Structures are given as structure tokens and as C-alpha cells.
Amino acid sequence: ENVYSTDYGWGLFKDDEKGGSGKASATKYKRTYTWNESNQLVSSVDDNYSTAYIYGQDGQRSNKYTANSETLYFNKMWTHHTDSGNSVYGGQSAKNIYLGETRIVTKLNSGTNPTYQEEYYKQYYYHSDHLGSASLISDYKGDEYQRIEYTPYGETWVEKTSNTGLEWLPYKFTAKELDEETGLYYYGA
């Protein structure tokens, strides 16, 4: 009788969880994706998010927009996220350091003039499995920050994050970015 939808925890709810009647409508959980002629995702719309994606001439994602935020992708080594709300992620830049094609460190900082301490304390080291997936992420001291296990097709099976930080680290299965709004991985293909 009840209709449920799951999107790996990205906010699709059953009516009565939000104070509604308890009678669920199948169309309430609808998400619409739109692709361009190059088969690139250009928009995703549901009850919680309306997200637009823009790509550069090289075919790689250059911008992601929602009603409250914007993410700029300068290259695989640097992204910048702005948020008009009171989110802890607003004004956050991520610098990625690679060894060959393998991401080994992400350094996070906020604002236009980050302090040395902020850059030092907000660096996260990736310990990857045979697919390149982040299975263990450690902090600047080498302590476990996040542990992730996956099903064979990339769904997060177990995720344990230390309660000492609030950083959203999107690089997960096969070292690709997990899009928070859709629950899809961006492979850049």
C-alpha cells in the first residue's frame, strides 16, 4: 500500500515523514534527468533539488548550479564550491594532489584567504582499493576519518565517518565524484 523510494539517502521521503497524509503518490518521487546531444547530464529536477550542469569545450564538467549553490570545476586538481545558505561547505575550495592518475590527498579550505592552520588540519589522505575506490580516508594525523565499503556496482554498503569533522568528501567509488544532489557518480566520460 505504501510507496517508498530510495536514493541512497539523498532526500526522497515518504509523505507522512514530512507530516503529510501517509498516502504516497508515485509521481511525488519523480526525478527528471535531461541529457544533451553529447550524452552529458545537463539537468536533474526533483522535489528537493533543481540542478544544472555546464560543460567546457573539452567535454568535462565546468559548473554545477543549484538554487543555493554553485560548484566550479577548474580541473581535476581544483574545485570551488559556494553556498548562499548557512552551509559549512560554503566558500570551500578543494585542492587534489595526485600521484600519476591516483588521488592521494584532498586539501580543503574556506574563504579567499585561508590560514595555514586550516590548510594543515583539513587534509585528507585516500587509501584506495584495487579499483581506486576510497576505502579508507585518514586525516592529517593519520587517524581514520572515514571508512567506506561498496557493493560490486558502487552502491555504498557501509560508511563510517569520524564525528570530529564535517567535511563532505565526494570522491568515493573508483575515485569518482559522487553527486550529492542526484546520487550519481560523475565519470567525466
Language-model regions: role of each:
Residues 93-97, 124:
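Short, surface-exposed beta-strand/loop micro-motifs that present aromatic residues
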Residues 17, 103-118:
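Short glycine/proline-rich turn/loop motifs
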Residues 1-4, 8-23, 29, 35-43, ...:
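A short glycine-rich beta-turn/N-cap micro-motif
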Residues 26-28, 46-48, 67-69, 91, ...:
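Glycine-centered tight beta-turn/hairpin loop motif at sheet-sheet or coil-to-beta transitions
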Residues 89-92, 100:
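C-terminal, low-complexity/hydrophilic appendages and adjacent surface loops
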Residues 59, 68-69, 84-86, 142, ...:
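Detector for glycine-centered tight turns/loop "hinges" at secondary-structure junctions
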Residues 8-12, 111-188:
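A motif-centric feature for acidic-aromatic and gly/ser/thr-rich catalytic loops and repeats
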